[in-house]
Each structure stands twice: as C-alpha cells, then as structure tokens.
C-alpha cells in the first residue's frame, strides 16, 4: 500500500527562533514596494507583569496562548510538545471572527492570513445531486455583519496546515522556542510557593519544570485532569463518526467524472445531505478535502480517537452506499480518488463539560480540548481554543503580578465556562440539521439549511470582554457579589446540561434548536 504522507513529525528545527529573527513577512518570496523585501513587524508588548507561564502543548490553542501571553507582558517560560516536530494533521477548518479578530494586533499574521485563507463559496446538495441552496457565504460574512467588524476579513475556510504554520512562524519571530519530544506525565502545584509544575517523562531521572502558571493545552485526556478533576471525563458516543482527509487536487482530477463537475469550479465548500448522513466536500485551488459523517450503524468496524490515516477510500465509498445506493456518481468518484493512507476514521464522542478548568490553587489551568472538547464537525473547536488563549492572557495581565496570577486563572474560568457550554450545544443543532434534516421545512425555505453561526459567537471580542468583566468577576470571587455573564445567547437562562439529556430529547423526536430559550441566532 502506498501511504500518503500525513501525521508525520516534520523538521523540529524549522521554526527555531534564530532562523526567523529577520525574515520576510511570509514564507513565500513576496516583494515589498519597488521590489524590496517586506519588513517584519512585532506588536508592541504591554509592560511586564512578572508572571511566568509554562505552556504544555503546541497545538493552535497552546501557540496562541504563548503569543498573547508574550504580547501581554508575561514571561513565556517554555512551550513543551510531546511530538518530535510539528505535525500537520487535519485538513480544512473554520475560524470564526471572534477568534481571529485578535490578529489585528499582529502585522505578520494579518498579512499571512489575508494571503493564505480560502475565499470559497458554500453550497448545499442532496446526496443524489439535487441542488438545495447556494452558492452563499457563511452567515458571519453576511453584509450586515461586516461593517463594524474588527480585525481581518475571515474567509469561509482556512487550510489547517497553513494556519498552523502561520502561528509557528509568529512564535519563532517572538523569540520563543517549542521544545519537542517533551511528554508531560503529570501536573502539580505548590500553593505555599505559588507555583505550578509538570513532571516530564524521561528514561533517567525525572525532569521537573515549574512556573507561576502552567497552561495545559495538551488536548484530550490531558494528565491535568487528574489534578483538576481527580479523574478523566469518560466519553460518550454520539452514534456518529467521520471519515476525513485532504489531498492534492491533481489526484482527483485524473478521474473524468470529477473533472466534469469540479475542474472549472472556483473554490467551493459543498454539503451533500443523505438519509442520516452527510458529506462535506471542499475543492480549493490545489487541494481537495472531504468529511463523511454516517451513523455508526451504517459502517463496519470501530473508529478510534486517533488521527492515524489508516482507512481505504473504498471503505468510505461502501459506507456511503450502504446508507443510500443512489449517491451522485461524481461524488463517489471523488471519494475513490483519495490516496490510500490518507483517510482518518474518527468517532464523534461527546464529553460532559466540567465547570472547573483550574487546579484548586489556580496555578494550573486548561485551555482548548483539555478543558472542553468539541467534535471535529462543530466548526467551533479551534475558535473556542483561541478565545480561551486570548481571555487567559488578558486575565493574567489584569491580575497584575505573580502572587495574584491565580486569580487570573479563576476569573478566566468564570468568564469562559457558560459561553463554551452554549457553544457546545450549538454543535448538536448543526449536527441534527444535517443528519436529521426536516425536508418539508427546507424545501419550503431552502435558506434554513445553512450551517448555524450565531451572532453571539462570531461578534464576540474575548479581549474586550475580559477587560470589561474582570472587575465584576474579581468582586464575585472575593466577596460573593452577583455576577452575570453576557457572552452567551441574549435572554437565555443558563443551566448546566449533559450529553445524555440532549440525546434523550433527540431520541424522543425533539429538535434541539426548538428547545433553546433566548436568542441563539
């Protein structure tokens, strides 16, 4: 079997800060005015807080935490990553404006993102080729939402590899180094000394690292859960899984049916909706990506939470045909054009959200998937991880000193928990929209098929919100004064919920969207 090269650790020295101290703005040889090299610019740093921050995990949430902590005046004591080098897993991602508005402060990343994001249109089809709606744009780019937006224009799609490399370049330009091959096996804190720490797995004597604040950005099943919650949160099956991949467009265009449908197409993101399943197809200038989401009773075999690309394209095609025998032939041809060794089969597992994301003394704090997992089809996991990073760095800045840094983590947790809980519930809304489609309603008003991107999510500014609410949150934690978050749906009366509760409603034939109180639009 010929394997497509994905999920392989790349050169760990490529982003050494010494290589990026005086480089052009982008990877490409873009010229500045009159043929000169463009200048590279770092944002102004806020005054030093004296707070040392150790970050575990060099995914997008961890890297953005490092960048924003650097900008806010904290001392980034290290970025530890268990992989042996950068790993470019994943394919096409959605980044919502709330997460990337902060890039307006970063000139290099602003330039890179504008140059590299994909201006695709979005279209919706039935599995057998009947057109439903589109071409259109994500609702966050409807004209009425663009006039007052801060930060860069946000295209419908980001190529994950390019977005991730943009963050790695910026980290290097700030003089920060990712330490690869560092597997953290446990977290601890010392309340008396006001420190958090980690123990790194080694073949010899254990390596210990400490800082005022330790940020666990190491994803699902982070060892930090043991310190914070006492145990790992068990996952629950959603009854769905996803096959996903990305590969060079040229490979797919060797097939006549694929060429006939997509060879002259501008960049497009299509959703093909079938009975109890759907397929997302992204066709860009140089890559093709797809994600097929069936019910578990349609497929054979068991998916595992691993980005190991070990699924044969024909397995995906047969799973599609077992659920519906009349798929559009061009779609099946596209699936079969994927190279072997490039497709991941990932279970869509849910984990009930924990209220606490910090250790008892507040010296260890979680961001991203380690705090709150989102299923890969949510279109919101990366955005919420970046919102976490921005909020945490700002709260630490407002805490003001290493002695009070623990208050910053506690306030960050208070500001984020309810918002993330509501954002997770939107994942159910969008999943049900595509796998349990109300066709009578859709054919009467096809625009209702659009993926839901709520205003309360994409119009949020996490940095401004932290500045606005820090004082109230501080008073709440110290004196018990009333505190109300305003970063979730207007009019919604927040209450905690469980995955089991939502699935019980779905099993009873209820639509999650119909059960929401307040304005979730």
From Swiss-Prot:
Its cofactor is FAD. FAD binds at residues 94, 160, 369, 382. Pfam families: FAD_binding_3. Keywords: FAD, Flavoprotein, Monooxygenase, Oxidoreductase. One of its GO terms (molecular function) is monooxygenase activity. The active site is at residues 244, 271. Residues 1-48 are annotated as: Disordered. Residues 11-21 have a biased composition (Basic and acidic residues). Residues 23-48 have a biased composition (Polar residues). Disruption phenotype: Impairs the production of monodictyphenone, but still enables the synthesis of intermediates until emodin. GO terms for biological process: monodictyphenone biosynthetic process. Pathway: Secondary metabolite biosynthesis. Its EC number is 1.-.-.-. Belongs to the paxM FAD-dependent monooxygenase family. PANTHER family: FAD-DEPENDENT MONOOXYGENASE MDPD (PTHR13789:SF315), MONOOXYGENASE (PTHR13789). FAD-dependent monooxygenase; part of the gene cluster that mediates the biosynthesis of monodictyphenone, a prenyl xanthone derivative. The pathway begins with the synthesis of atrochrysone thioester by the polyketide synthase (PKS) mdpG. The atrochrysone carboxyl ACP thioesterase mdpF then breaks the thioester bond and releases the atrochrysone carboxylic acid from mdpG. The atrochrysone carboxylic acid is then converted to atrochrysone which is further transformed into emodin anthrone. This is FAD-dependent monooxygenase mdpD. It comes from Emericella nidulans (strain FGSC A4 / ATCC 38163 / CBS 112.46 / NRRL 194 / M139) (Aspergillus nidulans). The gene is mdpD.
């Amino acid at each position: 079997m010929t394997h497509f090269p994905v999920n392989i650790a790349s050169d760990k020295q490529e982003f050494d800060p010494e290589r990026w101290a005086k480089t052009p703005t982008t990877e490409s040889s873009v010229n500045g005015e009159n043929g000169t090299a463009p200048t590279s610019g770092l944002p102004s740093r806020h005054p030093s807080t004296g707070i040392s921050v150790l970050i575990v995990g060099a995914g997008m949430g961890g890297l953005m935490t490092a960048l924003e902590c650097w900008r806010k005046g904290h001392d980034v004591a290290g970025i530890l990553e268990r992989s042996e080098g950068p790993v470019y897993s994943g394919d096409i991602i959605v980044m919502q404006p709330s997460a990337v508005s902060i890039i307006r402060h970063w000139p290099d990343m602003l330039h890179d993102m504008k140059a590299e994001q994909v201006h695709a249109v979005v279209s919706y089809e039935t599995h057998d080729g009947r057109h439903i709606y589109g071409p259109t744009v994500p609702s966050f780019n409807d004209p009425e939402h663009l006039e007052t937006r801060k930060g860069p224009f946000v295209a419908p799609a980001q190529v994950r590899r390019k977005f991730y490399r943009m963050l790695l370049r910026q980290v290097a330009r700030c003089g920060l180094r990712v330490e690869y091959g560092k597997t953290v096996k446990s977290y601890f804190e010392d309340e008396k000394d006001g420190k958090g720490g980690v123990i790194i797995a080694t073949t010899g004597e254990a390596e210990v690292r400490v800082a005022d604040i330790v940020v666990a950005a190491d994803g699902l099943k982070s060892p930090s859960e043991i310190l914070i919650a006492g145990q790992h949160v068990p996952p629950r099956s959603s009854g769905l899984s996803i096959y996903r991949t990305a590969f060079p467009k040229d490979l797919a265009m060797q097939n006549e049916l694929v060429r006939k449908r997509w060879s002259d197409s501008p960049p497009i993101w299509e959703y093909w909706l079938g009975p109890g399943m759907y397929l997302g197809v992204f066709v860009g200038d140089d890559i093709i990506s797809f994600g097929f989401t069936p019910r578990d009773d349609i497929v054979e075999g068991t998916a595992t939470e691993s980005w190991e690309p070990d699924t044969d394209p024909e397995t995906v095609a047969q799973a599609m045909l077992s659920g519906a025998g009349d798929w559009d032939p061009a779609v099946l041809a596209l699936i079969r054009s994927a190279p072997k060794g490039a497709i991941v089969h990932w279970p869509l597992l849910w984990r009930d959200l924990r209220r606490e994301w910090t250790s008892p003394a507040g010296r260890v704090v979680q961001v991203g998937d380690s705090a709150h997992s989102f299923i890969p089809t949510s279109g919101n996991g990366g955005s919420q991880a970046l919102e976490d990073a921005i909020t945490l760095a700002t709260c630490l800045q407002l805490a003001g000193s290493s002695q009070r840094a623990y208050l910053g983590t506690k306030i960050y947790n208070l500001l984020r928990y309810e918002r993330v809980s509501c954002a997770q519930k939107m994942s159910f809304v969008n999943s049900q929209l595509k796998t349990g489609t109300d066709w009578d309603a859709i054919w009467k008003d096809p625009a209702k098929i659009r993926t839901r991107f709520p205003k309360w999510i994409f119009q949020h500014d996490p940095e401004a919100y932290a500045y606005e609410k820090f004082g109230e949150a501080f008073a709440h934690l110290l004196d018990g004064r009333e505190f109300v978050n305003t970063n979730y749906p207007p009019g919604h009366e927040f209450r905690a919920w469980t995955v089991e509760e939502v699935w019980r409603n779905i099993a009873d034939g209820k639509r999650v969207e119909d059960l929401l109180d307040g304005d979730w639009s």
